[in-house]
Curated annotation (Swiss-Prot):
InterPro entries: KH_dom (IPR004087), KH_dom-like_a/b (IPR015946), KH_dom_type_2 (IPR004044), KH_sf_prok-type (IPR009019), Ribosomal_S3_C_sf (IPR036419), Ribosomal_uS3_arc (IPR027488), Ribosomal_uS3_C (IPR001351), Ribosomal_uS3_euk/arc (IPR005703)
Functional note: Binds the lower part of the 30S subunit head.
Organism: Cenarchaeum symbiosum (strain A)
Region (Disordered): 198-261
Keywords: Ribonucleoprotein, Ribosomal protein, RNA-binding, rRNA-binding
GO CC term, one of those recorded: cytosolic small ribosomal subunit
Matching PANTHER family: 30S/40S RIBOSOMAL PROTEIN S3, SMALL RIBOSOMAL SUBUNIT PROTEIN US3
One GO biological process term: translation
NCBIfam families xrefs: PRK04191.1, uS3_euk_arch
Stretches with biased composition (Basic and acidic residues): 198-216
Protein name per the record: Small ribosomal subunit protein uS3
Domain KH type-2 positions: 17-86
Example GO molecular function: rRNA binding
Amino acid sequence: MTAVKSVIRENYNMMKLREFLRENIKDSGFSGVEVEKNPRGTKITLHVTRPGIVIGRKGVGIRELTERLEKDFDLKSPQVDVKEIETPELYPGVMCNRMASHIERGTAFRRATMWTIQQIMEKKDAMGVQITISGKLRGDRSAFEKHTSGILPRAGHYADVIVLDDVVHVKTPMGLIGIRIRIARRDKFRKDFEMKAEKDVVPAPKPEHHDVKDETDPSAGTEAKDGAAAPKAGSESEQVEIEEEAMKSINTMEEDEEKLK
C-alpha cells in the first residue's frame, strides 16, 4: 500500500470512529477523540462532559466499549481513557450535538441557533462564535444561514490556534440538515509580546469607590430569578429537556415580524 492510500485509509477510519462514538456515547456529551499508537497498543482518549456514563457501573461500560473498538475497528490492544470537559459550552462538538437534538425534537432552527449562540457567548473565555446551518430548512429547496457573534479570526495563525470547529448532520422530516459551529476561545490566545513600564514611573493612585453588589449574579444563566438553582442534568438528554423550556423565551425573526405587523 502506498503512502497516500495509507493516509487516506487512516483518515477514513478516524472519521468512522468519530461517527461511531458520537452515536453510541451521545448521552455522555461526546466532544472529540484522540488516538495515539505505540508499541504497546493503541491509546484512545475520549473527551466527554459526563465520564460516569461512559465508564458505567463497576467499569462495565468502558470494558464493553473497549471490546467493541478492538473488534469493529481492528485496533491493537486499545486502552481507553476518559477525560472530563469542564466547560461544555466552549467545545463545538458538544454544542453541535445539543443543537442537533433540539432540531430533532421539533425546535425551530433559528430559535435553536440563537439559544446556542447565547449559551456560548455567556462564557468569559468565549471570544466569538459562528454557526452555519444548511440543508432543507423550510422547503424543498436547500438553503443555508450563517450567524456570527463576537470576534472570530478567519485566516492566519490565530485562526489555526484559537478557533475550534465541528460539523454534525441531523435527519429531519424535511431532509438532511448540516450544522457547523466555530468557536474562538480567549483562553487559547497568547500575545506575542507585552509592553513593560519604566521602573521610575510611579502609577497615579486610583480613586477609591465602592460598588453596590447585586445579590443576583447576571452571569448565572442556569439559575432561576428567585435564587433557586436550576435542576442539574444527569445526561445530555436531560440537559436538552431542561433547555427546551428556557428556549421558549427567545423570539425568532418570523415572530418579530408578526409583532411589527
